[in-house]
């Protein structure tokens, strides 16, 4: 409905109100103008005389009411006519939009069919070249999966990837980008260093906003992530142009040859930061930011993005088997490399120099137990259904406060807990959530570390209390006890179900069970499940023993070999 149409309707309603309040005489009511306005509102496309006849009849009815002094009936009729006009205008607007949407869908469908036919013809005629890949995006390849067979999709994907590999092999300079949304997900530092050490490579970290949560949360996270990488000396580019409110194109930042992805949830990236809008000339590699454990196997293995990655370097052989089982394209593009983030646990390094653990002045520092508290974001109705933070968050704070001489704590909240706790009403605002974190930071024996690497925190700790999902697998690399806080909504994938069998567990709302874990298992060193954890680790997680090298080197060498083979 246009402003002019809305103004016309409001004018008729005002006339009715003025007549009712005797601010306007009924005989001064502009009946002919109102009748004409109703005629235009009805405006039946296929029967103009009918709309004119109906409006004239209503006009005659109002004249009759005026002539007989029927003020209440006249006002009611004017209001009814205004409401009818509003309905007709809104119906027309809806139909016009629907018609426009259908027309756009038809045009998009025609264009999609053209793109599909074009890439299939290029493949069959063996004419896939660099120019074609520069001109098209991964939306075109996604159409092959949608409209063609899985086998055709695999064949054309392989052709696209081989064309890219040959181009990369010819280049003197290879451009490598790491695509991140949050420093807490950063797991590829060793891979970054391997490429950065090569004179024939240009390496950059690209940061994009991830549209989950409030605007404040989205852009606070985005700006903090850029600051994190910049301050640590990484070559860093923000993809969001705040002056024009848009996402920069990949050409603007130098057209990378290979992009490493850490997060597969492509629908939360907009514009050119969505993989569907990446040019086909980019070779996409996915290294999961966390260990896939919970039960959403579709989200973990069968999003459209999973099918558009050249290679997925997964955590374990079990995860490769799950890809075969749950993905539309099987394990076609999946390689079991081991989990890059865990490489540092295989290196003999001195104790971290970072000042992680705060100690109360009167604490016996030699005997203080260092405990990580890692709450997940999915409290209450949150999608994953793992979070228990809302049940015990104040009890955990008070317990840390009351045991200041015996314990030291790091609160490591999930990156999305800020958004999740506000969305679920636990805190009324981001500021209130931040005030809670400040309470922890003010304790003499606690510190909040929201982002950045956490391997050194794991190494220097004694135990963890958590419902954060990926940490359930990752903390096994330090061979220390952890308490998993459960709830009825917990679901696990194939790997997670086996993992859950060898964990200390307590109901997420049972604070007394949490205290017993700290006092008995941690302080008294009664870790009676150690052997079960070690057996699980050897069977599933010891990738260094299986591959004979760190995961970062395995990935680096795999990609290098693939490039060299096509020369």
Language-model regions, residue ranges each:
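C-terminal amphipathic helix plus adjacent low-complexity
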Residues: 13, 79, 84, 88-91, ...
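Charged, low-complexity interaction regions
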Residues: 20-32, 46-52, 66-75, 90-99, ...
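Donor nucleotide-activated moiety binding/catalytic core segment of transferases
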Residues: 241-243, 424-470
